[in-house]
């Protein structure tokens, strides 16, 4: 009996007709397409985009060169060099992030004990020349200085979930 049922199903092409019916059904439904450059979806408050380095309110950079972000990065995208200052504290002399390697996982942000490295909401950026994919310390500090108020607001709103 099972062979006869299988024979009639394959003879009538029921699977093919089911697929065609599904296609026909979705042809006349409204589309979910977004015209990207003109229309944009709202971003999540926890969106992880381009990196930034933050400063303290007195202007001193927050990074203490503990190198936890470099150690925890699964893609090995962060490179840090440090040096001791006259007062005995360590500070970074080189802080590079290779955006081609970075997978934007957020581990660097989570591991930072002083909230120095953060991921901003910036989604759209481009590179015109070879080597621009590596963001250095002055560029990261400039991004952080430009977006500090927004970074502080987002971190305060997300503080209950951290």
Swiss-Prot record:
One Gene Ontology term of the molecular function aspect: 4 iron, 4 sulfur cluster binding
Residue sites binding [4Fe-4S] cluster 1 per the record: 63, 66, 69, 112
Domain 4Fe-4S ferredoxin-type residues, every copy: 53-83, 93-122
Known EC number: 7.1.1.-
Cofactor dependency: [4Fe-4S] cluster
GO biological process: aerobic respiration
Residues that hold [4Fe-4S] cluster 2 according to the record: 73, 102, 105, 108
Localization: Cell inner membrane
Cofactor detail note: Binds 2 [4Fe-4S] clusters per subunit.
Family: Belongs to the complex I 23 kDa subunit family.
Function text: NDH-1 shuttles electrons from NADH, via FMN and iron-sulfur (Fe-S) centers, to quinones in the respiratory chain. The immediate electron acceptor for the enzyme in this species is believed to be ubiquinone. Couples the redox reaction to proton translocation (for every two electrons transferred, four hydrogen ions are translocated across the cytoplasmic membrane), and thus conserves the redox energy in a proton gradient.
Subunit structure: NDH-1 is composed of 14 different subunits. Subunits NuoA, H, J, K, L, M, N constitute the membrane sector of the complex.
Protein's name in the database: NADH-quinone oxidoreductase subunit I
Source taxonomy: Bacteria, Pseudomonadati, Pseudomonadota, Gammaproteobacteria, Lysobacterales
């Amino acid at each position: 009996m099972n062979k006869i049922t299988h024979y009639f199903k394959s003879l009538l092409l029921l699977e093919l007709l089911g697929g065609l019916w599904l296609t026909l059904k979705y042809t006349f439904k409204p589309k979910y397409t977004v015209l990207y450059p003109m229309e944009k979806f709202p971003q999540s408050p926890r969106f992880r985009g381009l990196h930034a380095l933050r400063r303290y309110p007195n202007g001193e950079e927050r990074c203490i060169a503990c190198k936890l972000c470099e150690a925890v990065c699964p893609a090995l995208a962060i490179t840090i060099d440090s040096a001791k200052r006259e007062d005995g504290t360590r500070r970074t002399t080189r802080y590079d992030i290779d955006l081609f390697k970075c997978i934007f996982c957020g581990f660097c942000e989570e591991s930072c004990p002083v909230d120095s490295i953060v991921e901003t909401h910036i989604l759209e950026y481009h590179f015109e020349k070879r080597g621009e994919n590596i963001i250095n310390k002055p560029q990261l500090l400039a991004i952080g200085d430009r977006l500090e108020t927004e970074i502080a607001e987002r971190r305060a709103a997300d503080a209950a979930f951290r």
